[in-house]
Amino acid sequence: RLRIESTVIPNVFDFENPPIKSDGYGDDFKKEMGISSDEIIVLQPTRIVPRKGIELAISLCSKIQKKLDKKICLVVSHLYGDEGSQYYEDLVKLALENSLKVVWAGERVGESRGLNHAGEKIYNLWDIYPMADFVTYPSLYEGFGNALLETFYFSKPVLVNRYQVYKDDIEPYGFKVVSIDGEITENTVKDTIKLLSDDSLVEEWTTHNYSICEEYFSHKLLRSTLEKLVSRSLE
């Protein structure tokens, strides 16, 4: 509107250096959380606040569970925030009504490893990503979507609710995701089941997504953009 030239610098991640091999710290996470080896793990890597749309993740998982002869375990990684516990309580009730197992892992997941107040082992999110079979990101709105970039970094298939910033700034790059517009449809369930049962399709999608991120959301891009801006300012 003001006809001022600008340069957009996106959120970035270290896609030049793929995740390192696990050091084994998180190997006991499933046992500690009561997750059996035959359960499909769906990770919701967010806090428990209404704008994260976690009820959509519960809906997806419960519908998949009804169609598959396998149990689904939804792992919600973080605690509820200062917005209160009502949303969390509503989600617990919804999961029970749908006979869905949910691991509320917030007391055991933190920014860094260590022990909690009860002397229990604390994991970080990077300990959990490798064991996820699928990731849900059904946010109603976001400032950008750092957890989505993190999901691409760990090469995991993902469901995304098409919040506005995603539609404007991320979707145009052509990522392969299971996308929804505020509801879990029959096609959503079919597409997710297809990914859960086809490793080659998962590899195709995640490799495609990673390559896009390497080009457009990497530290390399950030360095290049900043160098150009600094050079331009010195002219």
For each predicted feature, which ranges?
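A short helix/loop element that forms part of the nucleotide-sugar donor recognition site in Leloir-type
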Residues: P19-I35, D90
